Amino acid sequence: MQGLIQRVKHAKVEINNQVVGEIGQGILVLLGVEKQDDEQAADKLLHKISNYRIFTDENDKMNLSLKDIAGELLVVSQFTLAANTKKGMRPSFSSAATPSQANELYEYFVAQAKALNLTVAAGEFGADMQVSLCNDGPVTFNLAV
């Protein structure tokens, strides 16, 4: 499972010009689910994202987590993160989870984030979405478990 995380001032996701998820300061995570992933992988990634220290403290050092700043989380599914791009001029998605498995784990990830009492917004699995964000820094990390 991969989470491409971006520290944001604000972010939103729209479907057909309708905002379906929006956050203020926090993390936008683009979530990619692979065949071998399970709930344990989702839990591990969520723990890492919510505790990853990418927000600055009073000394301007990356020392605070999403939980520390009471930040918000926007989760957007993105199967293209599971692409193999090492060969050729076209990505291969052979390692991506099936849509049903990916949807199940995506929904599980969102539910578990809400259970942590985080402020959570989410896109819609499988939808054609437009994501807008103000990347703060920019600060972007690809976390894989």
Curated annotation (Swiss-Prot):
Subcellular location: Cytoplasm
Domain notes: A Gly-cisPro motif from one monomer fits into the active site of the other monomer to allow specific chiral rejection of L-amino acids.
EC number: 3.1.1.96
Source organism of the structure: Pseudoalteromonas translucida (strain TAC 125)
UniProt KW keywords: Cytoplasm, Hydrolase, RNA-binding, tRNA-binding
Family to which this protein belongs: Belongs to the DTD family.
HAMAP family: Deacylase_Dtd
NCBIfam families in the record: D-aminoacyl-tRNA deacylase
The protein, known as: D-aminoacyl-tRNA deacylase
Cellular component terms per the entry's GO annotation: cytoplasm
